[in-house]
Amino acid sequence: MEVTIENAGLERLGELLAWRETVLREVFSLPAEADLTGLMAENRRYYEAALPRGEHTACFAVAERKIVGCGGICWQKEMPSPDNPQGTCGCLMNIYTLPQHRGAGVGEKIVQWLITEANRRETGKIYLEASQKGASLYQKLGFEALNGYMKL
C-alpha cells in the first residue's frame, strides 16, 4: 500500500473537523451519542484562526485515494535559549491512523512529514503527548520521555 502525505489547509476544513471528531472520540473513549457540538465549534474556530496565520499545520495520509490517517503540529514561540536559539516549538497533535491500516507505517509517515515541516521552520523543540499505543513509534523516531514537566 503506497501512502502519500498531503497538506490540509482551510479548504479542507470539513475533512479536518470530521477527522478531529474521530480522534477525540477514540482517544477519550467517548460514546457515539456524546454531544460534541460545542467542542467541535471550538475546533472549527481554532482551525479558521490558526491555519491562515501559520500557527498550525495539518496533513492527511492518503492511500488508494482515501484518507487513512491524519496529523497536525501546533506552532508556538518560547524565549530563545541555547537549546532552541530560534525559540520555535512544535506540538504534535491529532496523530491518528484508521485501525485497519495500523502497523503499516502510516503513522510513521505522518510524523516524519511533520518533522520535516518542523525542520524547515528551524523548530528547536517538538513535543507531544503520547498514548500507550503510540509511544513506541515516537521512541523509534527519536523522541525521549521528559522528566521535570508538570501539568496543572
Which positions does each model-derived feature cover?
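Conserved N-terminal entry element of GNAT/NAT acetyltransferase domains
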Residues: M1-G14
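Conserved acetyl-CoA pyrophosphate-binding loop and the N-cap/start of the following alpha-helix
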Residues: H101, G105-W113
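Conserved beta-strand in the GNAT
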Residues: F60, K66-W75, C91, Y96
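Conserved GNAT acetyl-CoA-binding A-motif
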Residues: A118-A130
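Conserved catalytic-core motifs of GNAT/GCN5-like acyltransferases
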Residues: E78-S81, Y127-E129, K133, Q139, ...
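A short helix-loop-beta-strand connector motif used in the catalytic cores of GNAT acetyltransferases and
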Residues: R45-F60, C91
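Conserved acetyl-CoA binding element of GNAT-fold acetyltransferases
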Residues: D83-P99, G148
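Conserved GNAT-fold acetyl-CoA-binding loop/helix
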Residues: L24-Y46
